[in-house]
């Protein structure tokens, strides 16, 4: 059996960079990592609560965190920023003040910025959310996968692979289904591959979605 490494960790330092950038004493590492996890969870929960009900997608591509002694800079890359800020610019300020209180930043400022991702469906997280939404609405998994691949092709990618695992369509025995379009060279380190794994709760149980996108 082939042992599969995470495609993002495999390419760190070549085509991938870290999502969190900060320096700390070795004894403070665990605290900083926990703080990053809390920040990301709070942002996702806040956007889930405040998005428009009609849209089933949160649209978060990635959340980058940069820390200095006196500042925490959080950059949210969103495919559909209108879901959060349309007609409500005070929402970001509200999120900022709530997080500042929860983090207990006494001597540090917290700054949140939202950046729009061009070609949202080039990002695996947004694509996985789209597939999850389709599966929750009981759309056939094959239809959902084909539609997802169409969307990535329109966004101008070189290749995409989608995998769904679990009790697909409510079958009693769990199985794995996958589909690939174009090239996805996982062994080539210099290939820019975006990857994400996403879990979705359906009425039949939990399904795991994995998406690989080869952009350049």
Curated annotation (Swiss-Prot):
Keyword Lyase included in the entry's annotation: no
GO biological process terms on file: translation
GO cellular component: chloroplast; cytosolic small ribosomal subunit
GO molecular function ontology, one term from the record: rRNA binding
Location of the KH type-2 domain: 43-118
Protein name in the entry: Small ribosomal subunit protein uS3c
Protein keywords: Chloroplast, Plastid, Ribonucleoprotein, Ribosomal protein, RNA-binding, rRNA-binding
InterPro entries, per database record: KH_dom-like_a/b (IPR015946), KH_dom_type_2 (IPR004044), KH_sf_prok-type (IPR009019), Ribosomal_S3_C_sf (IPR036419), Ribosomal_uS3_bac-typ (IPR005704), Ribosomal_uS3_C (IPR001351), Ribosomal_uS3_CS (IPR018280)
Compartment(s): Plastid, Chloroplast
Domain of life per record: Eukaryota
Gene encoding the protein: rps3
Keyword NADP attached: no
Subunit structure: Part of the 30S ribosomal subunit.
Family that this chain belongs to: Belongs to the universal ribosomal protein uS3 family.
